[in-house]
A protein has these predicted regions:
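Lipid-exposed faces of alpha-helical membrane segments in multi-pass integral membrane proteins
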Residues: 4-11, 28-35, 89-100, 129-133, ...
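Structural signature of transmembrane alpha-helix termini at the membrane-water interface
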Residues: 11-18, 35-42, 96-107, 136, ...
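Membrane-water interface of alpha-helical transmembrane segments
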Residues: 19-26, 74-81, 85, 117, ...
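Alpha-helical transmembrane segments of helical membrane proteins, especially in multi-pass transport
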Residues: 48, 73-106, 138
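Short, highly charged, low-complexity non-transmembrane loops/tails of multi-pass membrane proteins
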Residues: 52-60, 153-164
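Alpha-helical transmembrane segments and their immediate juxtamembrane interface regions
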Residues: 104-158
Length: 164
């Protein structure tokens, strides 16, 4: 995706398209990922369940036995679904912030030296404005999942991890 994004940015500059296309491009990639994550909730394999709650990462058998013992399986599934919604929301936040930042910063005609400088400034500011908050949201989602598993099973963190 990164290579495609760089190619699109270069294409916008070379074709001297309106600078608003930079904002659209900046918002499109995390927006599409957010839609894919959200869309995964209507499949048998929501993204959080596929990526995190799987036998390669966690001791799913042990966790499921504890959830069954405490009759928390349905509530746990609902919380995993909530975590998937939260992850989708984090990508939508990133998409919105990318768009706002690009509209605010990139104002010069495409293909100009000022346009290239603004792209550099956009990249620089995207870290504190978008990347760090998004990373904090992701860590919050992982904490939410861990806290959910711990509170519903009583298992310690070390007991949750899959053994190799």
């Amino acid at each position: 995706l990164g290579l495609v994004s760089v190619g699109i940015t270069g294409g916008i500059g070379l074709l001297q398209l309106d600078q608003q296309w930079i904002a659209v491009k900046e918002a499109a990639i995390p927006g599409l990922i957010g839609l894919a994550v959200l869309g995964s909730t209507w499949t048998r394999y929501p993204l959080i369940k596929t990526l995190l709650y799987n036998p390669n990462t966690l001791d799913v058998g042990r966790i499921q036995r504890k959830l069954d013992e405490t009759s928390n399986s349905a509530l746990f599934e609902a919380r995993l679904l909530n975590a998937t919604y939260m992850l989708s929301g984090a990508f939508f936040f990133s998409s919105l912030m990318n768009y706002i930042l690009a509209v605010w910063i990139v104002t010069s005609p495409t293909g100009s030296a000022a346009f290239n400088e603004e792209l550099g400034r956009l990249t620089l500011l995207s870290y504190p404005v978008i990347a760090i908050p998004s990373a904090l949201m992701m860590m919050g989602i992982f904490y939410y999942i861990w806290r959910t598993i711990h509170s519903m099973t009583g298992l310690a963190f070390e007991d949750l991890l899959a053994s190799r």
